[in-house]
């Protein structure tokens, strides 16, 4: 078992342990010994794990209800959120009760936002079941849904009281979801995580599957270190958005047919190409990045137009009036923050 403590405004632990899902009450009882519980999941994850988690919670004396919505990024919207919160109200949940987000990034984002806003905030636990959620989105307290204007534009910062990651749940993931998570893992490799790039270069995906718990722990520790410095993303936490400025534009323009990790991979390459043009990154580092991404069977190009990507960037959360904060790779394994105008941003895609 690996336990990583995050000293945020609401301190909590990230527990990474094989088989932990079967002992979920052992971790929740000390935090919430007696309450009503709502388990939020989606149509992909629920058939695998919902019944067993619900039975374990009920056996431990909890009153449990559940809410399952259609899987996919297209469900992460205001209408689905309101339906969830209305259901929570219909179940008479109180501020003393608990929400469990059982699923990947979409489940965690939307369920977390419901927990942040229902009755002005109730406790919640993240139980990530996708690689992307395990290494990134379940940690740090960012919650949100998408709007017509862009991705993650309606949300709140709300730290969970626990993140419980059972790597055995990743065994049911299709290959696409493994690759999706690898997009975010490669991102961490460009944020000075020691040895991560070397490991990914040696045996892409195969090594990752064999040592997934250690890789998850590396990424979570890296994110924890950043979140503890800058919980609400006023400074260094923006580094975690490497590949996201262009990546979010690709997701939105594709109507979310391009998955997040895939879009982040393309976004990293596009930003790196721009950095080479601006003299901020050498061409060899760009080629190594592209080779690493391709080795994980992720794309490095897109048919989405420059105009579409930049239109979405105008609604990026890091945009402030005429300027936007971007993350630029400046060497192989290292990236830096930079503030540019939207006109200057466009030159990175020329």
Segment roles from a protein language model:
Residues 106-113, 134-135, 249:
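Short glycine/serine/threonine-rich phosphate/pyrophosphate-binding segments
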